[in-house]
Structures are given as structure tokens and as C-alpha cells.
From Swiss-Prot:
Belongs to the class-II aminoacyl-tRNA synthetase family. NCBIfam families: asnS (TIGR00457), PRK03932.1 (NF003037). Coiled coil: none annotated. This is Asparagine--tRNA ligase. PROSITE patterns: AA_TRNA_LIGASE_II (PS50862). Its EC number is 6.1.1.22.
Amino acid sequence: MSKQLVSIIDVPKHIGEEITIGAWVANKSGKGKIAFLQLRDGTAFFQGVAFKPNFIEKFGEEEGLEKFDTIKHLSQETSIYVTGMVKEDERSKFGYELDITDIEVIGKSQDYPITPKEHGTDFLMDNRHLWLRSRKQMAIQQIRNAIIYATYDFFDKNGFIKFDSPILSSNAAEDSTELFETDYFGTPAFLSQSGQLYLEAGAMALGRVFDFGPVFRAEKSKTRRHLTEFWMMDAEYSFLSHDESLDLQEAYVKALIQGAIDRAPQALEILERDVDLLKKYIAEPFKRVSYDEAIDLLQAHENDEDTDYEHLEHGDDFGSPHETWISNYFGVPTFVVNYPASFKAFYMKPVPGNPERVLCADLLAPEGYGEIIGGSMREDDYDALVAKMEELGMDRSEYEFYLDLRKYGSVPHGGFGIGIERMVTFVAGTKHIREAIPFPRMLHRIKP
């Protein structure tokens, strides 16, 4: 049997040709003289059909019956080389199918644990290495791949340079209570929460930089939106205003959505994602509302029949129900800007004339997906940043390199970060972030 293989996703290019596919058996059916195989090879799913008389005619009765019997008794996830003629077939949901003419078993699969029936989440997570083979899980990973590809493409086209920040650090970029600590040859070190502080150094050297890699948050949270290890894209840029930053973030998110539509249409179809709704998010401008305007809206509607969130005062932080209501109210991704300085990071630049608010923005995704981007203008004045750190009781010695950036040619600059898993969850339309990464790390899960 020829081993010049054709990927399933390329099968439509070979109508009327005999081809060979390397695949796994996802499922099978049939009776009597006919057998149907549901095949997958990582690129897509496909159906093959085998007819007993055709095998007897081609190989003779003994060998033909043996090969057909092999097909009928293939178990789930057996790996095979399958050869056949690609034929158009309107009855097939693919529009074509493979008329199987030969088969070769590569690797047998006995007692595959994830059978085509309902399984509990814990069981599926314990068998995550196998669950990834299922149709929906494959689709989610294909969307993840499309979003990562679109990330690199977007930043390259917009003049950004890939800049790799360290994973081990001696300081905290975000909440110091959420750090994973390790011993670095006798010195305390921490797994990175964000590459932002180092990216600011990159922006002062290269103008526009971005980083993409794993980050770690020791959050004792069991919500559907939190992981302890996830992949973050951080971008930093010099000589860009707050409004220009929001424009860039909006363009980036739209590019990610478009990238998934262009590169993973079959995956979106498998997940039954409303593509027209995704296209609406691309076509319409994102809404921008200030934190204080958002609080006013929440207070004005808190007694509405369909609301389900707690009362907030100005100065309170949003919870997930508040974020959901705000984004659903506007119906498109919504930037909430200028939050109180009291619960935002030390490095954020105050709003001119209003030191109680900072030049920052969170992008809230509709449909209940909440925050997907956080960004801000960074404090570029040395004395102001030192004063803020002293106010918070921070140890300046751990941030000397960061303060140096304000001493030697400081410029207006800002940046933002996006957790790729949250974006994948939003674009894919899935309910839980654990499915947006191959092997999720959560509060009570570190295996497999």
C-alpha cells in the first residue's frame, strides 16, 4: 500500500481519485455487506464506506472476506492506513465520502475508556490525554491555534517585535499574594505573573514589543474563568496615547475573531458557534464607557426584573455578574475605562486632573464571558512612581531596573495583556476555560 498520504482536510481536492489516509477510527457502524467508518486524522473528520462484494472482487474470496471482517471489527481509536476512491455524495454531511478499497491496521486499541456516551467531567479530565481526541475538543484546539497564528500575524503587520520576558523573576507584576515561589540557589524567586515589567524595558529599546508565553497565578479560585497556569499575550508600546491604545486593542481582538473564522471554519461549525454573531463583533465598533458611567448604569438597573447582581457604590470593584450585565447591555465587546486607583496596579498612570482614577481599560466580552483584556498607560514620571511605591510600602530595591526606565529618556507608553484561554473560550462559545488549554492546571488539578 502506498504511504503517500493525503490529509482529510485536503480530500475535496481529490474527487475522483484513489488516495490513502492515515487516520484513527472515531466510530463505526453498518451491517451485513456494508460498513461505515468515521475517521479522523487531526485535520478533520471524514466518512469511509466499505462494501463486502468489492473486497471479494478485488482480493478474492478468502482475502477479501478477511479484510472486510477486519473493518467490521475495528475498535475505537485503532490507527489505520485506509485507501479508497473519493466520491461526491449528497447524502453525506461532508458532501463526499471514501469508497474504501484497502485497509492496513497500524496500531490496535483495546478497551478505549472514552466511549461514545456521556461521561462526568472528573472522568474526562482524568483522561484529558484521550479526551483531546474527541470532536469538540479537537475543534477548540484548532481555534486556539488560529488565534495564536492571528496574534503573531497582527503584531508583525503592526510593527511589533517578539520580545521574550523571563519566567523566573524576583518581583511581582501584579498581586504579590498570587505568586508561586521557588528557591533560586538560595534566593527567593517567583514564577512570572506577567512579562509586562520587562516588556516596558523592551518598548524603550525597540518601540513596540509583544510577548507570548505561560504565566502563573496562585489564585485559589474554582470559577469557570480561572486557571493557575495559562498563556498570556502582553504588548507594550512607546509614544502611543490611551485612545490609540484602545484602537489597537480593538483591532487586535477583531483580528483574532476573523482569524478563527478564516482558519478554523469547520471547528466553529462543530461547536455550533454563531458565526454571524462573531461577524457582528467584527463589524460594529466596540463600546467605550467609563467606570463611573458603568456604576451609574448598574445602579439605575439594579432593581430591573432580569438583573442578578449586588449593589455597588462608586469605588467598588466589579464582580462577574456586573461584567456580564454591562457587556450584555451594550451587546458588543465593551471597554470600561478609568477605574479607581485603589484596586489597580501601582504602575498605572493617573487620569490628568483626577488622581483617584487611572488611565486603564478592561475589555468585557458579551455573552457572559467577562474580562478578556486588561491594559493601561504606565506611569512614566520617576518621582510619581517612587511616591506611589512608597505609599504602598513596596520594596524599591526589587524594582530598580524598572525605575531606571523613568530616569533615562522616559516617554509616554502603555500596554495590555490578554489571556489566550479566555479569548479561545469566547470565540469558541464554550462554557469553561479548562477546555481552552490542552492540559489545564487548576486549584485541585495538576495531572495529567
